[in-house]
Amino acid sequence: MSKFMKSLCKIAIPVTLQSTLQASFSIVDQIMIGQLGETNISAVGLCGNFSLIFSVVIGAVSTVAGILIAQFIGAEDTKEAWSSFDVSLISGMVIAALFLFAAGVFPSQILGLYTRDVSIVNTGAVYFRIVAFSYIPMAAGNILSSWLRCREHATIPFWAGFGAVAVNTGLNYLLIFGKFGLPCMGIKGAAIATLISQFFNLAFIAVGFALCIRKDEDKPVWSLRFSKITIKDYLIMIMTILVSEFLWSLGQNVESAVYGHLGMANLAAYTLTCPIQGLIVGALSGLSAAAGVIVGKRLGRKEYDEAYTESKKIMYAGLAGAVAVSILLILLAGVYTGLYRVDGSVKELGKILLMVFALYAPVKVENMILGGGIIRSGGNTKIIMVIDIVGTWCIGIPLCLLAAYVFKWDIVGVYTLLTTEEIFRLVVLLVIFKRRKWMISLS
């Protein structure tokens, strides 16, 4: 096996397994909550939309950390790598505290932005107030994981994630349904299970992080100063990613608000498909993570031809995997929706939505690898921001509003028209990739 394939497998496989396991257990969680009825499904789904904003913003911070750490490790400049880690960790914790305050103090007001259904808002507020405290361990765990993956210790976050989802699923069973003498807590029990599992995840990663830096003989350096780039460069990089990811996730929330106003059946149908969508994307997310590290290290060493060649190999792997998984999803869509105890019309809508998603999945995956991994590894985050803003707000959102409020289509028509904006993203990203101007060494 070549050195490239070894590095690809050491990063991609653990990340893929971690994402797949988390999405799989998310499906189990969704099915458990689904036994409580459509109101609970919808409430948890809407809470997840706000949490998506947090996850994407923290993901942006860890992406910046990964870009810089990978390039500086490739250039064998550990001091700059540690500076990147330190600044990103502080940034992540501040952001987590702000989101905790918003979700913990104003849950009903936030949920009211998505739906007018009082029962959904009241049910979701109970869940939201508890889940908000999980933002702190999620932020810290993400930044620590970025360092570990850049050092090719991706198995640590994987095992941490495996343990966390197992804890979460077990506690969900015990607390939602009141098993083994415990009280039947319903949706509140699901929230408590999520909170405990996130602290478990952080504890596992922190121990693994300490052991790995000792094994690698890395001497931690506490420094908020850079020598190869300026603070201004760092802030521009992180702010463009934050703006990009925030506006993208905000767009997802606008779309969810539109779905919410289409009625409970349409919203429930879309919500029950979300775990499967996460599973499909997660199954191939390891390639995006691996691309960021592998290509970033090549750029740090100024090996531009190798970076371009290896990028294409990762893209081909992603396309093949996405096509295979899409075929499987089309065949099994009806089996999945049949697991839910919901109205037959909701099941049928969910089945059709999954088939539409399967058709677009290869395009989504290529966009993830190109935009989220390869092109960003060069540090030029501005162009990705522009693509995200134009794709979401100039194409996606207008199409969504047009389909829902002008054409008066149901959830299937709205989702199908909206998702065509992924094609625009792919065309633009491929043009940028072939021009090679994204290949920049920060060292």
Regions found by a protein language model. Name each.
Residues 20, 24-42, 111-118, 174-185, ...:
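Helix-terminus/linker motif at the lipid-water interface of multi-pass membrane proteins
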Residues 3-31, 35-36, 52-68, 93-100, ...:
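N-terminal transmembrane alpha-helices
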Residues 15, 19, 30-31, 48, ...:
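Transmembrane alpha-helix boundary and packing residues in multipass membrane permease domains
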Residues 62, 131-150, 157-168, 190-206, ...:
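Short runs within selected transmembrane alpha-helices of multi-pass transporters and secretion channels
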Residues 41-101, 138-157, 269-333, 365-384, ...:
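Small-residue-rich hydrophobic transmembrane alpha-helices
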Residues 1-15, 69-136, 182-239, 295-360, ...:
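Short alpha-helical transmembrane segments in multi-pass integral membrane proteins
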Residues 38-49, 124, 128, 264-279, ...:
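Small-residue hotspots at the loop-to-helix junctions and early N-terminal turns
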Residues 10-29, 130, 141, 164, ...:
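Transmembrane helical elements of multi-pass membrane transporters/channels
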